[in-house]
């Protein structure tokens, strides 16, 4: 049985629970009666379970290996920075997602029933939801950090390291706080079809829809709105500063004035950090948007109970797990030192002045996302 975080109670018509790797999931796919009466549905469901296991194993390996490489890469850096800190936090969150969400889902599919005590059920569900919130709120913290770095660069330099730790501390604190209801809602339970599962213990099925709506807004819609507004302001600031730079350069005849103004421009390192952050956010949106939209439609019974819905749901439910496997790849693309050999150009260094070598060395360091 999968490690669904939002599996609801069985309805009157009895439903076959869905197989998914995500910590939150739609509560049903096809009715239990349909699964018994239609042989093709039953065989399809069983065969796809094997394919799902293969998919989950692949995602698990890529998630653990990829994020381990990222953590090792950030750990071996002698020079740390705010961006190193946030990349590390994101990799830690993704690693725990692989261990607690994906791996437990794989184990559940092998065992069928939930074998552990009720306390273990509640703790596992709680940790799964904590990671669900944390994966989103860490991205919000990263967005706020990038906003201050671009919009208020002078203020940002004062206590930047402390501010980054405070943002991450708030993100994890809110994640643990908002997940507390899970300890009450979920528990070990015998379902109507005889299975013993770690399931939602609702007094009535009508509680499920408002609960899932609240979770969807706290985990996805509200954070996505905040992130979108923040990066909108960041892009606007970059555009305004670039236009001001063009105006000054076109009207400037004094070299010293131009040089002093250039120092106030946004560095290439910060621009690259923004690009890295935006790609991470876009990956999050691509992986989670189909899931939450499908889940909301399903909880309000707006989707038809058809085989096409079954096909779509099985694919969509694996997308959140895919996000944790993609993030290390994005880091690899933006960090040349991780994925390509370092080329030291000694001959060029010998022809450069001390100032040119210093500036190039600084840009080589700052151009990597972990040092921005």
UniProtKB/Swiss-Prot annotation:
Residues bearing carbohydrate: 4, 13
TM spans (from-to): 53-73, 83-103, 123-143, 166-186, 214-234, 277-297, 314-334
SS bond list: 121-198
UniProt keyword annotations, A-Z: Cell membrane, Disulfide bond, G-protein coupled receptor, Glycoprotein, Membrane, Receptor, Transducer, Transmembrane, Transmembrane helix
Top-level taxon: Eukaryota
Family matches, as InterPro entries: GPCR_Rhodpsn (IPR000276), GPCR_Rhodpsn_7TM (IPR017452), NPS_rcpt (IPR027294), Vasoprsn_rcpt (IPR001817)
Membrane topology: Multi-pass membrane protein
PROSITE patterns the UniProt entry points to: G_PROTEIN_RECEP_F1_1 (PS00237), G_PROTEIN_RECEP_F1_2 (PS50262)
A GO CC term assigned to this protein in UniProt: cytoplasm
Family indicated by similarity: Belongs to the G-protein coupled receptor 1 family. Vasopressin/oxytocin receptor subfamily.
Name this protein carries in UniProt: Neuropeptide S receptor
Lineage of source species: Eukaryota, Metazoa, Chordata, Craniata, Vertebrata
């Amino acid at each position: 049985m999968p490690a669904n975080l939002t599996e609801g109670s069985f309805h009157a018509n009895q439903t076959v629970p869905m197989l998914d790797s995500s910590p939150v999931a739609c509560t049903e796919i096809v009715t239990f009666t349909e699964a018994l009466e239609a042989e093709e549905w039953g065989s399809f469901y069983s065969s796809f379970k094997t394919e799902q296991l293969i998919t989950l194993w692949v995602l698990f390996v890529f998630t653990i290996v990829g994020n381990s490489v990222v953590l090792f890469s950030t750990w071996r850096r002698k020079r740390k920075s705010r961006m190193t800190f946030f990349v590390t936090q994101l990799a830690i969150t993704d690693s725990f997602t692989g261990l607690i969400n994906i791996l437990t889902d794989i184990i559940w599919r092998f065992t069928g029933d939930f074998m552990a005590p009720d306390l273990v059920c509640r703790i596992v569900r709680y940790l799964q939801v904590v990671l669900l919130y944390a994966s989103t709120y860490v991205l919000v913290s990263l967005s706020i950090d990038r906003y201050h770095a671009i919009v208020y660069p002078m203020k940002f330099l004062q206590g930047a390291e402390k501010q980054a730790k405070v943002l991450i501390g708030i993100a994890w604190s809110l994640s643990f706080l908002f997940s507390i209801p899970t300890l009450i809602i979920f528990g070990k339970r015998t379902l109507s079809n005889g299975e013993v599962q770690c399931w939602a213990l609702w007094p009535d099925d009508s509680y499920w829809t408002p609960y899932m709506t609240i979770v969807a807004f706290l985990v996805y819609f509200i954070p996505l709105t905040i992130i979108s507004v923040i990066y909108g302001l960041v892009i606007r600031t970059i555009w305004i500063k670039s236009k001001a730079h063009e105006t000054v350069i076109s009207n400037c005849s004094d070299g010293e004035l131009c040089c002093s103004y250039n120092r106030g421009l946004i560095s290439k390192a910060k621009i690259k950090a923004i690009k890295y952050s935006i790609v991470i956010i876009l990956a999050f949106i691509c992986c989670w948007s189909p899931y939450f939209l499908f889940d909301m439609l399903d909880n309000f019974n707006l989707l038809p109970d058809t085989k096409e819905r079954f096909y779509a749901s099985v694919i969509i439910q694996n997308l959140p797990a895919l996000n944790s496997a993609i993030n290390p790849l994005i880091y690899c693309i933006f960090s040349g030192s991780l994925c390509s050999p370092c080329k030291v150009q000694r001959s060029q260094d010998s022809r450069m002045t001390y100032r040119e070598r210093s500036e190039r060395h600084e840009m080589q360091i700052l151009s990597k996302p972990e040092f921005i």
